[in-house]
A protein has these predicted regions:
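Mid-length scaffold segments of soluble, non-membrane domains
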Residues: 102-117, 122-125
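Post-signal peptide N-terminal segment of mature Sec-exported envelope proteins
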Residues: 26-48
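Soluble periplasmic/extracytoplasmic beta-strand elements of cell-envelope proteins
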Residues: 37-42, 109-115, 129-133, 145
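Solvent-exposed loop/turn segments at secondary-structure junctions
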Residues: 45-48, 77-81, 115-120, 150-152
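Short glycine/proline-enriched turns and hinge-like loops at secondary-structure junctions
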Residues: 51-53, 122-127
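N-terminal segment of the mature soluble domain
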Residues: 47-109, 141, 177
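C-terminal/domain-edge helix-coil "capping" segments
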Residues: 17-34, 136-223
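Sec-dependent N-terminal signal peptides
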Residues: 4-14
Length: 223
């Protein structure tokens, strides 16, 4: 019996190892094209929260910079996008992107699709569902694509007992309501883009090919 258990465990371990895929295998185009500069496109908002587009737009700049890329500031490009009717990114997500290469000099354009945004004050959760798509402005190829359903945990522990529970519920509700949408959006972006190959200005540039890539769709809770 023990032999069967050990054999089963070994089989599970081997299958899990076999399923793990490297970043160069998951995102080969990233390593082929080696984009240096990224233009952040205005988010495509599929939720009923009209303001989600504007506040999420500002969350993308810092995480991409931290991954080692030169990113055109949304504040600088917003006026250009609006004048070129590019503020509605839906019309560009599958279209030719050469104009962004010619005008801005961007090697790639990052598209985001906000699919859900929910706030649970008593439960202490902010949930964001976002898909990230990085496309080459040169070839039009998709270089990177990943989607996440991320819960930002804003719960507060007020101690034990009935009184402590009531304090926790009240503090959690206040903390969740007060949590800035930009902060929650940034945490979502940082988590989902965690397996994105690093750019030229990253510390692991050219050295992360064999690191494990994440699943194309990820669910997680972050603090």
């Amino acid at each position: 019996m023990k032999k069967y258990i050990i054999l089963s465990l070994m089989t599970l371990l081997m299958s899990s190892c076999a399923e793990q895929i490297t970043r160069i295998a998951q995102y080969p185009k990233m390593y082929e094209e080696k984009p240096l500069t990224i233009a952040v496109m205005p988010p495509i908002n599929q939720t009923q929260h009209v303001e989600a587009k504007d506040y999420f737009y500002t969350t993308l700049y810092a995480p991409l910079c931290e991954k080692g890329y030169y990113v055109y500031s949304p504040m600088m490009t917003m006026e250009m996008f609006q004048s070129e009717s590019a503020y509605d990114a839906e019309q560009f997500i599958e279209a030719d992107l050469s104009q962004f290469r010619n005008v801005l000099g961007a090697d790639a354009a990052m598209f985001t699709i906000i699919k859900s945004w929910k706030r649970n004050n008593l439960g202490g959760k902010l949930t964001a569902g976002v898909e990230y798509i990085l496309r080459s402005t040169k070839t039009g190829e998709t270089l990177y694509r990943r989607e996440g359903l991320i819960k930002v945990d804003t719960s507060v522990n007020g101690g034990g007992g009935i009184f402590g529970t009531l304090v926790s519920l009240a503090a959690t509700a206040i903390n969740t309501a007060a949590t800035d949408k930009v902060v929650a959006g940034r945490k979502c972006t940082v988590f989902v883009l965690s397996d994105m190959p690093e750019g030229k200005y990253g510390t692991k540039y050219g050295q992360d090919q064999k690191l494990p890539a994440g699943k194309s769709y990820v669910k997680a809770t972050v603090k």
